[in-house]
């Protein structure tokens, strides 16, 4: 053993025995090895009983709801790292990329099926001739399936090139560092080509191979699938645009929510606020912190300088349990604050007062006296949690039996943690000196750059051995928005790709259908129809399945977005404007896509159209 320092543990605990025996920390990870998965599951099942046995007397009648000791398989640790602001962020990015890829590929498969079945009439005579020459249906199915697989193989090679080219953009949008896995790519691509080719080619192969040779060769008009074929293509267009519109709605809601959480009321004004995480450096001692705070207060433009055991961007906090008569113990977040903490953050005071130097009883820095009582400030969620009906009713009341706390004030809220977590029940206690491992906060007026330079100069003069870090509240909170920002950007890329591919397919279908209806258009114009009438006819025909697609897209997007928004403590409402706006954009782009073919068909002269074969 190489031991740097040893400190003896006294046989007799200090005066604050409750702290000696009940102080704990959960911000650690223990690595365990089990012989197999069943042993790990059996061990995890014993954890609630373990907690009840060792901590039940301190955590109330249901301790497993207060404290949990979950097991995380090491293979999941990369996507679900335990603790910190990154929890769920990596998994969300992977799920987003997977959804974008799968849904975009689905739209591309539908495109192939639609266009292949639309072109079936042109290949009907080829199929009939091959059957006359002895080809049986299985041979034709293999041929058409092979054509689909070959086309997908070519698309896969093009996709590899596009992937290599677009990876920098995807990495920038998603905050990733992906590289193309050339070693794994060949087997994965082969599997994808076979699966996608099979899915895309199966229905067209069945449709093309079933044309009867005699009927096709005897007919002057090539078969086009009839009304059933048209209906099946319309259904596929509905699915295609339903997915694309749902994509667009989801992207709109994602962007709206990320903007909302950045602008939401956190209980303090972010402008004119500077956070100093450097004060929490382990090398910073109270004797050094006091003169630094005093010097910062004297700087021009500084309104107040405060400190607290947490600040914006700190998701973790100390936990305490308040024992209430006749009720389970209440687990609360406990924050230690120094002078001018509330003046710097300026939360809304609902009732009572906040800490000040005029009331000597506010100081709770001597924990040996906590058993005799201490003054605390609580936030709004604590009112009902402690059994009070209003802020005014809570002021002056004492809660807790073994460690009584007298409520002197109630503030509205101070949200420092992730927007995905609801406001925690929080108690604030006062330390007239500097709280341990304090986060500094400066409220100022004037130029942020001038204030930062002045604070930096003061810091270098008084604490040169400790790196200076000064951030805005938004910079500290950015870690909580990162995953959703990335998801919004990736979904935006996916929505654009989905709509683009869907419009390619729609353009192809419009081209095919207008070509088949040239004679019909000529007859209509001969009977008096104008070019505008022809355009309206064709646009309405293709717009109908897109309008119906909203019936698929809206419930799908609503359910998905409602589930996603439920994970936020403060979420936007699912306004109808998101759905109407996304659908309007999709319809507008689809109309532009169709319009080129419709205008070309409407300009055809009746004489040419009637002679057209």
Predicted segments with their positions:
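Interfacial "coupling" helices/loops that link adjacent transmembrane helices in transporter permeases
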Residues: 108-150, 505-543, 597, 604-605
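Alpha-helix N-cap/start motif
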Residues: 40, 124, 137, 213, ...
């Amino acid at each position: 053993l190489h031991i740097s320092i040893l400190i003896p543990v006294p046989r007799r605990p200090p005066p604050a025995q409750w702290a000696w025996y009940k102080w704990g920390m959960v911000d650690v990870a223990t690595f365990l090895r089990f012989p197999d998965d069943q042993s790990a599951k059996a061990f995890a099942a014993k954890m609630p009983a373990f907690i009840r046995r060792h901590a039940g007397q301190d955590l109330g009648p249901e301790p497993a709801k207060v404290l949990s000791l979950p097991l995380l398989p090491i293979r999941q640790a990369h996507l679900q790292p335990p603790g910190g602001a990154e929890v769920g962020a990596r998994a969300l990015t992977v799920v987003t990329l997977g959804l974008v890829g799968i849904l975009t590929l689905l739209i591309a498969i539908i495109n192939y099926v639609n266009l292949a079945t639309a072109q079936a009439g042109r290949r009907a005579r080829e199929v009939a001739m091959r059957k006359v020459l002895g080809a049986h249906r299985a041979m034709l199915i293999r041929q058409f399936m092979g054509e689909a697989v070959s086309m997908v193989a070519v698309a896969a090679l093009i996709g590899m090139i596009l992937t290599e080219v677009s990876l920098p953009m995807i990495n920038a949008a998603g905050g990733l560092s992906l590289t193309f896995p050339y070693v794994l790519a060949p087997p994965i691509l082969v599997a994808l080509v076979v699966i996608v080719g099979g899915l895309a080619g199966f229905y067209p192969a069945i449709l093309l191979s079933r044309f009867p040779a005699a009927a096709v060769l005897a007919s002057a008009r090539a078969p086009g699938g009839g009304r059933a074929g048209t209906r099946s293509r319309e259904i596929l267009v509905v699915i295609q645009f339903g997915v694309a519109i749902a994509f667009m709605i989801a992207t709109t809601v994602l962007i709206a929510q990320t903007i909302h959480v950045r602008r939401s009321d956190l209980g303090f004004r972010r402008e004119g606020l500077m956070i100093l995480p450097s004060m929490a450096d382990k090398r910073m001692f109270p004797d050094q912190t006091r003169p630094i705070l005093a010097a910062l207060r004297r700087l021009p433009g500084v309104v107040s300088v405060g400190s607290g055991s947490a600040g914006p961007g700190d998701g973790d906090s100390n936990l305490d349990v308040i024992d209430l008569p006749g009720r389970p113990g209440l687990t609360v977040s406990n924050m230690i604050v120094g002078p001018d903490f509330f003046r710097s953050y300026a939360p809304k005071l609902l009732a009572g007062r906040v800490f000040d130097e005029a009331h000597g009883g506010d100081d709770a820095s001597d924990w040996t006296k906590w058993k005799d009582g201490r003054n605390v400030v609580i936030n709004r969620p604590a009112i009902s949690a402690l059994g009070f009906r209003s802020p005014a009713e809570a002021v002056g009341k004492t809660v807790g039996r073994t460690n009584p706390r007298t409520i002197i004030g109630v503030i509205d809220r101070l949200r420092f943690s992730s927007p995905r977590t609801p406001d925690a029940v929080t108690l604030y206690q006062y330390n007239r000196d500097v709280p341990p491992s304090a986060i500094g906060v400066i409220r100022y007026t004037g130029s942020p750059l001038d204030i930062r330079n002045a604070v930096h100069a003061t810091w270098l003069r008084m604490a040169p051995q400790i790196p200076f870090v000064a951030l805005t509240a938004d910079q500290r909170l950015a870690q909580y928005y990162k995953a959703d920002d990335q998801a919004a950007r990736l979904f935006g890329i996916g929505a654009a790709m989905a709509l683009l591919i869907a419009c390619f397919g729609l353009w192809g279908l419009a081209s095919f259908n207008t070509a088949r209806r040239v004679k019909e258009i000529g007859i209509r114009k001969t009977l008096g129809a104008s070019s505008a009438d022809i355009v309206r006819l064709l646009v309405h025909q293709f717009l109908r399945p897109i309008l119906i697609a909203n019936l698929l897209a809206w419930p799908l997007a609503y359910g998905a977005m409602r589930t996603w928004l439920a994970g936020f403590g403060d979420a936007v409402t699912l306004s109808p404007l998101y759905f109407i706006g996304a659908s309007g954009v999709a319809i507008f782009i689809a109309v532009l896509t169709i319009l080129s073919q419709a205008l070309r068909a409407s300009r055809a002269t009746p004489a040419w159209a009637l002679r057209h074969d």
